[in-house]
Amino acid sequence: MIIAIMIGRKGSRGFKGKNTTKILNKYCCEYPLIAAKKSKFIDKIFVSTDCPKIKKISKKYKVEFIDRPKKLANSKALGEDVFKYSYGQIIKKYKKKIEILVLLMANAPAVNKKMIDKGISILMKNKKFDSAVSTSVYNMWSPLRARKLSKKGTLIPFVPFETFGNPKTLNCDRDSQGNVYFADMSVSVVRSYCIDKMKEGLLPQKWMGKKIAPIKSWGGGDIDYAFQIPQIEYWLKNNR
């Protein structure tokens, strides 16, 4: 069985109501559900939430709901724990072998049917991969450019320049270190053992396992701030 799980809670801290904000005449949380509904592989769609509005919006997509316990419905709860709990509840109910999970987020609308089906196809065709996840190339946000504040109040490299090879080959050109692929959180297609063995996965999104294939996209990202909305609108207009 192949399933999709979308997670999203009420009470966002930074951008209030981000999961249910309107983007191009649809709610943010609708886009992942539309993509999952159109997939030719997904058997069932589940929504893990404590938000009445997300439930109301999701009903028309014929999803099944997983109520979140209070300990997983606050700002300190990790996505990995919510996915693991949701997976456990589904296993208890259906007692069927789940081969692949499509993990979605209510605040990550830059996803479509093509991306989901490509991710599933990658895992079906190549057993060496633990997962396939959507990626966007953001060279302008390379770790090479990242800084942190020192105790003296000065900006210093976040990671040693030697991490990227010979520092003499690097420069201010955003492309000098090569392409920088970010897992943009639009979709993670994972084998079930990645959830079972979550602790063994790579940081920071341990549900992806260790051997991760890219689902190449562009301009994706989960929405945490209102200023991201125009970028997502642009993506949606160009990926209908």
Model-assigned labels for residue ranges:
Residues 1-16:
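N-terminal nucleotide-binding beta1-loop-alpha1 segment
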Residues 21-22, 47:
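Conserved SAM-binding loop
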Residues 28-44:
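A short, N-terminal amphipathic alpha-helix
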Residues 201-221, 226, 230, 234-240:
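Catalytic donor-sugar/metal-binding loop of nucleotide-sugar-dependent glycosyltransferases
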Residues 46, 52-102, 110-111, 115-118:
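Short phosphate-binding loop-to-helix
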Residues 81, 109-203, 215-216:
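Conserved core of the sugar-phosphate nucleotidyltransferase
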Residues 42, 96-98, 126-129:
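Short, high-confidence coil segments that cap the C-terminus of an alpha-helix
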Residues 55, 195-196, 229:
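A generic structural signal for short hydrophobic patches within well-formed alpha-helices
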